[in-house]
Every structure is written in structure tokens, then in C-alpha cells.
Amino acid sequence: MNKNFYNNFNDNNMELDFLTNDNIYDNMNNNNVNNSLDIPLIDEMSEKNDKFCKLMKKRIDGLKIIASSCRKNNTEDAIAEVGYLKDLGIANDYLNYSLIKKDIKLIYLNNDEVLKLFPTILLLLESKYDNYFKTAFQSAFVILKLYQNIIIDAKTCAFVSGVDLNREDKLKKYDKIIDFFYRIRISSKVAKNMNKYLELQNFLSELDYFLKKCK
């Protein structure tokens, strides 16, 4: 788990405010405090600890499933578990391992897997953490490199008369992929950080070309 692990509790609505509540420490240091006042405090801390332990167990169980799926090269199950957990720390680590740091020649994602990944990428893109934002656009850049020529060719090739259900299904999925890329392009976070990362500028340059070709 990375260094942002504890920050992520707020992302999961897990507020650990009892650790920073000055009133609690004032009460604990007050020798004249009525013992009856300690009981709600203990109950509150026990409840928070219980939530913490449950969240930890959920994360560990999820990581086991993801790790097992990766060992078996079962990308679909790994992506599904990442999406189910909605844990940005785990998603960030998974995308770094499976997409960004991997040789692009060794990456294969089918249409359905890409579509399942994009909601997670969009969540990371809008995160307040810079490293999550960077992971998001780098992952999107990898997917763009994998798919841009395939989608452009499919969208621009001459229409063949007759019904081709397989082609129509692919085009519908390609349209959804294009829509996700468009949502990334108009993101206020992307506009705000445009001059911060050279790689982001390169990504946007290729993305603009791709979106123009797909109109």
C-alpha cells in the first residue's frame, strides 16, 4: 500500500476526526472530568476502530483477488475488482503496475475491459492528489496509443451494405470510448494542469488529433 493509504480514508468517507479532536484530548487531560463522560468517548473510538478494521479487511481481501487475477493473467476479473472496491489507492497502484510501467507491446485490453477501466480513470483524474491525477492521464495515454488507429480506421472506413451486427457492436463500444476521452479532454483538472506536465501536453496533442478524426 502506498504512502497515501491513510489519506484515502477520507476518500472513502472514513473520517478519523477522533484522532485530531482537541476537545477529546482536553477531556482526557482534565483530572476533574466526570468518568461518565469517558464512556461515549470510548464507544466512539471503538466504533471508529471497528470501521477502520472492516475497511482494512475489505482492502486486503480485494488486493488478494486482484493479485490472484494478475498472476493468472485474468485482466477482466482484476479490473472488475478494482472498479468494485472504488479505492483510489488500490486503483492507482494497479494502473501503475498493469499499464504505465508495462511494455506497451505486452498489453492487450479488449473493448469491454477498456470501458470498465475508464470510470476508475476518471475518478483518479478528479482526485485532489497529484500522483493520482498523473496516473489517470498516463493510463489514458496508454489506452489511446493502443486504440487510436483501430478506432480511426473503423470510423473512417467505407460503409459496406448489409447488416453486420459484429461491426455495429464494435462501433457502439468505440463511440463510448471516444466519449470517455472527450470527458477527459474537457476536464477542468486537465485544463488546470496543462502546463505542469510535458507528458500531459503530448497526450492532449494526440488526443486532439484523435477526437478530430473521429468526428
What are these regions (language model features)?
Residues 1-48, 213-215:
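Eukaryotic intrinsically disordered, low-complexity regulatory tails and linkers enriched
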Residues 36-215:
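Alpha-helical solenoid scaffolds in large eukaryotic transport, assembly, and signaling factors
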